[in-house]
C-alpha cells in the first residue's frame, strides 16, 4: 500500500521494515478484540508518514492460507496418535496467536463445534505444563498433580537389520516409553558361529536408508543347521530415552548387549521430521522392495528345506528306486 500510494519501495531499508512490522504486529493483536485497527507510523521512509486502517475481515482474507495451514499439525497429531477427533476431551489453546478469532473458529469447526478451553493463559500454557511435570518428577503427591501423567514416546521406530538388509522394528514409532520388548531370531547359514546385531532408528523398510545407532556381535553359537539356533533380542528403553539392546542364545545362555544414549548418534528434531517425510514419500517403493526380499528369503528357505529332505538317509533309497 505504501509503495502503491507514495511510489516508494522501502524493501531495502531494514529500519523502516522493522518499524512497519512492529506496527503490524500491534494491529494484529488489536484485531483479536476489535473489528478494526489503525496503523500509524510517523516518518516511515524518506520523511513520509504512513497511516492506514485494517479491518478484521481484511486481515482474515490476507492470512487465509496461513490460518488454514494451522490445521495441518492438528490433523497430523491425531493421525500419529491414531485418534479420532471425537475422542478429544478438551482443546487447550497454546501460544499468543491462538487468541486470533479466526484460528479459534477454525479449531472449533474442526472439532465439530466443540467449545475451546480458555481457562489457561495461552502465553503461560507451556510454563504451566513444565511446572506440573517438574512437580511430578520432584515427587509432589498433592491432589493437584496426582491424576496427571505426561507420557513420552519413541520419535522413530527402533529395530535391527535382518536378512537382505531389511529393517525389522521391535519398537514402533510413537510407542509410549518406557517400554521393553523381545523377539526371537535365528541364523541364516549352517553352522553360523555368531550373529551381528546392528541397531537402527528410522521408518524406511531397508536399513541402508535408516540411521545406524550401534552394533555388537554375539559369538559362540554352537554349530547347527540354519534356522535352528534361537537368539532372543531384547530392546529396553527407559523414561530418559536410553536404549539397552541385548541378544541371548537360548541354548547356551550366552549374551551380549549395548547401551545407546540420547547423545550417541541420535537424530535431531529436524532430521527426524525429514526421515518421517521420506518414509511417506517412498512408502510404495519400500513395500515393493521388502516384498521382493521376503520372496527371495522364502525361496531360499524352501530350497534349503528341499535339499535337507533329499539328503535325508531314510528317503535316499526311495528316491533312487523312483
Curated annotation (Swiss-Prot):
Keyword flag RNA-binding: no
Molecular function in Gene Ontology: ATP binding; ATP-dependent protein folding chaperone
Ranges that cross the membrane: none
Pfam name, any one: HSP70
Keywords, ordered alphabetically: ATP-binding, Nucleotide-binding, Stress response
One Gene Ontology biological process: response to stress
Keyword Nucleotide-binding: yes
Family annotation (PROSITE patterns): HSP70_3
InterPro entries linked to this entry: ATPase_NBD, Heat_shock_70_CS, HSP70_C_sf, HSP70_peptide-bd_sf, Hsp_70_fam
Family note: Belongs to the heat shock protein 70 family.
Miscellaneous note of the record: Heat shock protein 70 is a major immunogen in a microfilaremic individuals from a filariasis-endemic area.
Name this polypeptide is given: Heat shock 70 kDa protein
Organism: Onchocerca volvulus
Amino acid at each position: 500500500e505504501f509503495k502503491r500510494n507514495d511510489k516508494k519501495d522501502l524493501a531495502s531499508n531494514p529500519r523502516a521494515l522493522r518499524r512497519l512490522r512492529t506496527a503490524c504486529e500491534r494491529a494484529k493483536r488489536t484485531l483479536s478484540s476489535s473489528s478494526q485497527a489503525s496503523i500509524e507510523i510517523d516518518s516511515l521512509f524518506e520523511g513520509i508518514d504512513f497511516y492506514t486502517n485494517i479491518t478484521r475481515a481484511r486481515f482474515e482474507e490476507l492470512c487465509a492460507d496461513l490460518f488454514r495451514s494451522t490445521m495441518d499439525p492438528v490433523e497430523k497429531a491425531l493421525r500419529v496418535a491414531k485418534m479420532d477427533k471425537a475422542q478429544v476431551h478438551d482443546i487447550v489453546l497454546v501460544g499468543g496467536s491462538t487468541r486470533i478469532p479466526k484460528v479459534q473458529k477454525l479449531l472449533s469447526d474442526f472439532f465439530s463445534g466443540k467449545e475451546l478451553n480458555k481457562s489457561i493463559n495461552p502465553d503461560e500454557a507451556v510454563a504451566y505444563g513444565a511446572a506440573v511435570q517438574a512437580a511430578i518428577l520432584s515427587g509432589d503427591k498433592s491432589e493437584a498433580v496426582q491424576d496427571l501423567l505426561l507420557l513420552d514416546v519413541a520419535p522413530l521406530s527402533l529395530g535391527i537389520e535382518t536378512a537382505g538388509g531389511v529393517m525389522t522394528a521391535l519398537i514402533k514409532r510413537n510407542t509410549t516409553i518406557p517400554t521393553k520388548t523381545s523377539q526371537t531370531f535365528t541364523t541364516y547359514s549352517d553352522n553360523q558361529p555368531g550373529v551381528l546385531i546392528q541397531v537402527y532408528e528410522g521408518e524406511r523398510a531397508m536399513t541402508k536408508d535408516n540411521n545406524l545407532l550401534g552394533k555388537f556381535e554375539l559369538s559362540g553359537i554352537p554349530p547347527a543347521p540354519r534356522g535352528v539356533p534361537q537368539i532372543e533380542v531384547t530392546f529396553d528403553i527407559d523414561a530418559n530415552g536410553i536404549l539397552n539392546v541385548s541378544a541371548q542364545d537360548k541354548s547356551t545362555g550366552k549374551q551380549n548387549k549395548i547401551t545407546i544414549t540420547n547423545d550417541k548418534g541420535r537424530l535431531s528434531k529436524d532430521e527426524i521430521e525429514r526421515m518421517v517425510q521420506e518414509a511417506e514419500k517412498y512408502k510404495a517403493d519400500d513395500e515393493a522392495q521388502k516384498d521382493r526380499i521376503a520372496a527371495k528369503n522364502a525361496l531360499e528357505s524352501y530350497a534349503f528345506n528341499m535339499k535337507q529332505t533329499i539328503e535325508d538317509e531314510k528317503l535316499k533309497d526311495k528316491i533312487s528306486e523312483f
